[in-house]
Amino acid sequence: MTEPDGSRTEPLGQVDALAVPRFAGLRTFARLPTLEQVERADVAVLGAPFDSAATFRAGARFGPAAIREASLLLRPYNERLEIAPFAAVQIADAGDAPASPIGVEEGHAAIEAAAGEIAGAGACVLGLGGDHSVTLPLLRAAAAAHGPLSLLQLDAHTDTWDSYFGARYTHGTVFRRAVEEGIVDGGASLQIGLRGSL
């Protein structure tokens, strides 16, 4: 936690790789503390292990675990950029939202509730998906805490279908729903990297 004078009253950053080898210990994002280990987080990493709204290939539900596994090699200092990203703000791993794989609405509700609790406590949520549909409940939680959002979307597709096989909530309908629900201001948002037909 940061005191008014700028000092910290709790550990900040990653587990020391010289004290605990990278292959050992709790699997958190970048070996950062869990949300329970810190008094307050500036950023909370939340896994959204959900892919029931994918229309082609399943498996994205394993994304949060794979990202955490790959993040074990992240270093506390980036020499090329000359920054120590984990020393500037308190980042903690909030674990995974208990998203049911059976129903899209139920899965999204669990993700939104978990993200809403974090955002309501004042932390920025960094979501790890999951299929693209997990963006909608994350955006809902952020908008509930901050009001309508401007969106910078880096993607090959717009994800603005109206429906797919009659379903209005899929990985390809996320941003249409977000604009329709008023949680994203389409006029103040930008999509970068688009290719293909949709």
Spans of features found by a protein language model:
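Conserved alpha-helical scaffold segments that buttress catalytic/binding sites
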Residues: T2-L198
